[in-house]
């Protein structure tokens, strides 16, 4: 059979009527209605019609209108022939939350363990759907719920539902979550037992009892287990020299991949003994085979002892990096990791040398499938590596471990507090289904777009709104029915949604009242499907009235080829009339197509952006002269992002931090009395005073018992908006729009705190104030006096030293000059000798 080729788009007469009806409306309203009408009118098949938002299909046999696909707000079609499926929700299992049920029992209400469930079926005016026609066995099908079992823990409500959804329609589902008090905890400690971790093992064996006691104070339903790992017993990971294989280091056992020493159980006293008896080993390269151990610890659920209803914690302790997929090729292992359990009865990993290390994505998938929270307890040198790793593993965290693991108890306690005090909703929806979460968490304000709530306590209940939207129908009809799971991260409980996508019309299938073989309305030469003819071979035309072998009237003009009675041009001048139907011209470019009942549509004359039709193929497609945007894009040229995700602060909160509007995926910041906001998410305001002064007194009284409100009654009465969380050091995370506050109190001590307002107020204060050292006045006075005396003595001694040196130099010079002096022999000119001798010169000696 030849599918009819000439049911095209156009609605000229109808458009004139619509224009007259909405003459008093604004231009924007008129344009919106005309766009909707044109979009519907261009659809020629029932299934493409109902896959278009706001459209309905008329399967009236003698339909006189221009198009069977019309806007479903119109009354163009008799009700009994109109088909427009509606979105329907039916709750199947709706057990009450455990905390709520216990509260009702304690109050003596004796009410049902179930809240009411809704049940309905989608239908059209022409036919009813069989979506809910099947009956289920058991009480749940009869009443829409099941009785609550006293031994069952329920933390998410509802638990199961059915949903029939049309394309592009959004449906909101209310989800409630409450952490049950005393919820069971399974903690499996996975430790690196290479030689460098020997002191850590010794410390853990002494802290095992303390770890058990600490966790039992949190929940009395606590199981503890222990496993260890080294690396693959192959070069270059370990030395394969026979002697080294037996004793790779002093007091070491032979290397191994992974071993489960102690499955999870409530005999926590044996944990310390197992750790103490475990022997360290040695390897060659720096990274360890921890990923092999993680995969086996998660995949081997029964051998490890993971319970169905428990919060599952896997503490991974190491001081080194990790091998991942591909590293096994260095040792000649090319078979990829299959993600299955391969433990011997003794708990040893049997495929360590047969399979490669798992990839990060494999670890992440196993974590999601088994609701595991991994805590990477690593030394400071490796912390930055594992902080990047946790970004790719759902529900995981990284924390600093002391070099000897002495802080392991506090580390586990703090990480468990962080995990248990928050809830984040995740789902397994495919790319055809979009789920957006909204919640007000614990605040009384309006809901904001977020899938995570923090600072929860046991018993507190939060609600989420899951907005489900079917973006498009999958190409394979087998995918039109899917099961979607929504679950809190790290909790093995799911809300199951049995989704049926309304992508087809019953009248297109045999057995429907709208499906007639050799119908009279098709001249007896075709099958009527939803009111349109699917002609037999050799016949064509709107009613299969034309024969391919009879050419007498094949090219005769017909008024049905003209847009309206006033038009004198067939097929809008872009085609020719064949047997009362337009055959549109072909364009030189085969990608460019002219279409429509009167060739009035095309896919190349739409608005352009950046020289591309509808901003490019990734943003939208051109249909009948208008851009049809793909999911996530909007605007006349599909150039704007529909989602506000790019306007949401990374840490969550309000759109544009509550200080602007999101336009085309970009925040437009506002100016208020405080000042001008800026930044990518309008999170910065250099001129704003903030709330530091407002929060100061409450932080002082609650954290330090000082300040104007230090009186207990005053503090309790005035400080009800928040309770500050103590931290060792206050550091700002600019991505979360946090503000730093610093003050000095009456003791001249500096105290610091930070706050953020992402949906609700969070305050983090430094646990210890920074106070100046106390001044010892007597010591200062005595010190000054002593300093003066000592300085005086020093000056005197210095003066004495200098004078002595000077005198000695002078004396030495004097002595030197005296010793070197040469005196001439002379007589005193006034001295007279006692005797005088006179000699007569004339005397001759006689």
Swiss-Prot record:
Can you say where in the cell this protein is located?
Cell membrane; Apical cell membrane; Lateral cell membrane; Basal cell membrane
* UniProt modified residues of type Phosphotyrosine: 831, 843
* Single GO biological process annotation from the record: integrin-mediated signaling pathway
Cite a GO CC annotation. Answer: costamere
Q: Which residues are glycosylated?
A: 72, 266, 277, 403, 428, 557, 603, 644, 718
According to the UniProt record, what happens if one changes residue 831 to A? No effect on lethality
Keyword Transferase included in the entry's annotation: no
Extracellular topological intervals:
29-777
Report the Gene3D superfamilies cross-referenced here. Answer: 4.10.1240.30, Cytochrome c1, transmembrane anchor, C-terminal, Laminin, ntegrin, alpha v. Chain A, domain 3, von Willebrand factor, type A domain
Specify where it is mainly localized.
membrane
- What results from changing residue 843 to A? No effect on lethality
Entry's SMART domains? Answer: INB, Integrin_b_cyt, Integrin_B_tail
Pinpoint the I-EGF domain residues. Answer: 507-545, 546-600, 601-639, 640-683
Q: Which GO terms describe its molecular function?
A: integrin binding; protein heterodimerization activity
Q: On the Cytoplasmic side, which residues?
A: 799-846
Q: Which UniProt keywords apply?
A: Behavior, Cell adhesion, Cell membrane, Developmental protein, Disulfide bond, Flight, Glycoprotein, Integrin, Membrane, Olfaction, Phosphoprotein, Receptor, Repeat, Sensory transduction, Signal, Transmembrane, Transmembrane helix, Vision
- Expression by tissue: In ovaries, strongly expressed in follicle cells. In oocytes, expressed in the forming dorsal appendages (at protein level). Expressed in the embryonic dorsal cuticle, the larval eye and the wing imaginal disk. In testes, detected at the interface between somatic hub cells and cyst stem cells.
Q: Which cysteines are joined by disulfide bonds?
A: 46-55, 249-252, 300-341, 441-453, 473-741, 507-530, 522-533, 535-544, 546-579, 561-577, 571-582, 584-599, 601-624, 606-622, 614-627, 629-638, 640-664, 647-662, 656-667, 669-682, 685-688, 692-701, 698-771, 719-749
> Which residue windows are transmembrane per the record?
778-798
Description of the deletion phenotype: In zygotic mutant embryos, midgut forms primary constrictions but fails to elongate and the visceral muscle does not flatten but remains attached to the midgut epithelium. Embryos lacking maternal and zygotic mys show a delay in midgut migration. Mutant larvae present an olfactory phenotype, showing reduced response to isoamyl acetate but normal response to ethyl acetate.
According to its UniProt entry, what is the function of this protein?
Answer: Integrin alpha-PS1/beta-PS is a receptor for laminin. Integrin alpha-PS2/beta-PS is a receptor for Tig, wb and Ten-m. Contributes to endodermal integrity and adhesion between the midgut epithelium and the surrounding visceral muscle. Essential for migration of the primordial midgut cells and for maintaining, but not establishing, cell polarity in the midgut epithelium. The two beta subunits mediate midgut migration by distinct mechanisms: beta-PS requires rhea/talin and Itgbn does not. Required for rhea/talin correct cellular localization in the midgut.
Additional facts recorded: The absence of the beta-PS subunit results in detachment and rounding up of the muscles, thus the gene encoding beta-PS is called myospheroid.
This protein's assembly is summarised as: Heterodimer of an alpha and a beta subunit. Beta-PS associates with either alpha-PS1, alpha-PS2, alpha-PS3, alpha-PS4 or alpha-PS5.
The record's annotation in PANTHER family points to: INTEGRIN BETA SUBUNIT, INTEGRIN BETA-PS
Family label: Belongs to the integrin beta chain family.
Official protein name in the record = Integrin beta-PS
The record lists the organism as Drosophila melanogaster (Fruit fly)
């Amino acid at each position: 059979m030849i599918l009819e080729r000439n049911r095209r788009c156009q609605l000229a007469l109808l458009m004139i009527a619509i224009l007259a009806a909405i003459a008093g409306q604004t231009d924007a309203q008129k344009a919106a209605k005309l766009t909707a009408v044109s979009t519907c009118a261009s659809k020629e098949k029932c299934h493409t019609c109902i896959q278009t938002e706001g459209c309905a299909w008329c399967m009236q046999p003698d339909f006189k209108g221009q198009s069977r696909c019309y806007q479903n707000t119109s009354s163009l079609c008799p009700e009994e022939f109109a088909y427009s499926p509606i979105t329907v929700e039916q709750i199947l299992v709706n057990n009450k939350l455990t905390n709520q049920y216990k509260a009702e029992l304690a109050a003596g209400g004796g009410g049902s363990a179930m809240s009411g469930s809704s049940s309905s079926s989608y239908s059209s005016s022409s036919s009813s759907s069989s979506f809910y026609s099947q009956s289920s066995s058991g009480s749940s099908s009869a009443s829409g719920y099941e009785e609550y079992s006293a031994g069952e823990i329920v933390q998410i409500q509802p638990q199961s539902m059915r949903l029939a959804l049309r394309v592009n329609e959004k449906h909101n589902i209310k989800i409630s979550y409450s952490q049950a008090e005393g919820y069971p905890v399974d903690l499996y400690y996975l430790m690196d037992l290479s030689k460098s971790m020997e002191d850590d093992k010794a410390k853990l064996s002494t802290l095992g009892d303390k770890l058990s006691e600490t966790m039992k104070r949190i929940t009395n339903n606590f199981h503890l287990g222990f496993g260890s790992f080294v690396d693959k017993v192959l070069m270059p990971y370990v030395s394969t020299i026979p002697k080294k294989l037996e004793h790779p280091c002093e007091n070491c056992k032979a290397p191994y991949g992974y071993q489960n020493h102690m499955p999870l159980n409530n005999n926590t006293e044996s944990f310390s003994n197992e750790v103490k008896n475990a022997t360290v080993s040695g390897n060659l390269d720096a990274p360890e085979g921890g990923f092999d151990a993680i995969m086996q610890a998660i995949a081997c659920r029964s051998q490890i002892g993971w319970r169905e209803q428990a919060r599952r914690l896997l503490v991974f302790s190491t001081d080194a990096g990790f091998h991942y997929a591909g590293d096994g090729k260095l040792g000649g292992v090319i078979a990829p990791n299959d993600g299955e359990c391969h433990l011997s009865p003794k708990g040893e990993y049997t495929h360590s040398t047969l399979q490669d290390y798992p990839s990060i994505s494999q670890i992440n998938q196993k974590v999601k499938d088994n609701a595991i929270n991994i805590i990477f307890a690593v030394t400071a040198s490796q912390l930055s590596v594992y902080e990047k790793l946790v970004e790719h593993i759902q529900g995981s965290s990284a924390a600093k471990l002391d070099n000897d693991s002495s802080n392991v108890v506090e580390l586990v306690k703090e990480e468990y507090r962080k995990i248990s005090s928050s809830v984040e909703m995740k789902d397994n929806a495919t790319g055809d289904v979009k789920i957006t979460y909204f919640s007000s968490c614990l605040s009384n304000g309006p809901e904001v777009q977020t899938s995570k709530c923090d600072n929860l306590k046991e018993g507190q209940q939060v609600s989420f709104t899951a907005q489900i939207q079917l973006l498009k129908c999958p190409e394979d009809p087998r995918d039109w029915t899917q099961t979607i799971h929504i679950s809190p991260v790290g909790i093995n409980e799911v809300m199951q949604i049995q989704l049926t996508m309304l992508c087809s019309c019953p009248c297109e299938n045999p057995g429907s009242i709208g499906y007639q073989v050799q119908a009279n309305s098709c001249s007896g030469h075709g099958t009527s499907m939803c009111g349109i003819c699917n002609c037999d071979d050799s016949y064509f035309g709107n009613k299969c009235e034309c024969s391919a072998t009879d050419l007498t009237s094949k090219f005769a003009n017909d008024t049905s080829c003209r847009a309206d009675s006033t038009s004198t041009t067939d097929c809008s001048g872009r085609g020719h009339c064949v047997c009362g139907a337009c055959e549109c011209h072909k364009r030189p470019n085969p990608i460019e197509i002219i279409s429509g009942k009167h060739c009035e549509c095309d896919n190349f004359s739409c608005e352009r952006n950046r020289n591309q039709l509808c901003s490019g193929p990734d943003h939208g497609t051109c249909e009948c002269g208008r851009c049809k945007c793909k999911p996530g894009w909007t605007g006349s040229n599909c150039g704007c992002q529909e989602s506000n995700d790019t306007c949401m602060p990374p840490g969550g909160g309000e759109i544009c931090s509550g200080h602007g509007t999101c336009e085309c995926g970009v925040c437009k910041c506002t100016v208020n009395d405080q000042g001008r906001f800026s930044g990518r998410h309008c999170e910065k305001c250099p001129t704003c005073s903030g709330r530091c002064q407002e929060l100061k007194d409450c932080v002082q009284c609650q954290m330090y018992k000082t300040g104007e409100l230090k009186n207990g009654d005053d503090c309790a009465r005035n400080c009800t908006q928040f309770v500050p969380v103590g931290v060792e050091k206050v550091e700002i995370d600019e991505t979360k729009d946090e503000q730093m506050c610093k003050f000095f109190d009456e003791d001249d001590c500096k105290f610091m705190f930070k706050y953020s307002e992402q949906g609700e107020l969070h305050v983090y204060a430094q646990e210890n104030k920074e106070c100046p050292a106390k001044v010892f006045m007597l010591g200062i006075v005595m010190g000054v006096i002593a300093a003066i005396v000592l300085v005086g003595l020093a000056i005197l001694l210095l003066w004495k030293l200098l004078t002595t040196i000077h005198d000695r130099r002078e004396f030495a010079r004097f002595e030197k000059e005296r010793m070197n002096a040469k005196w001439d022999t002379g007589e005193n000119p006034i001295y007279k000798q006692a005797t005088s001798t006179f000699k007569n010169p004339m005397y001759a000696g006689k």
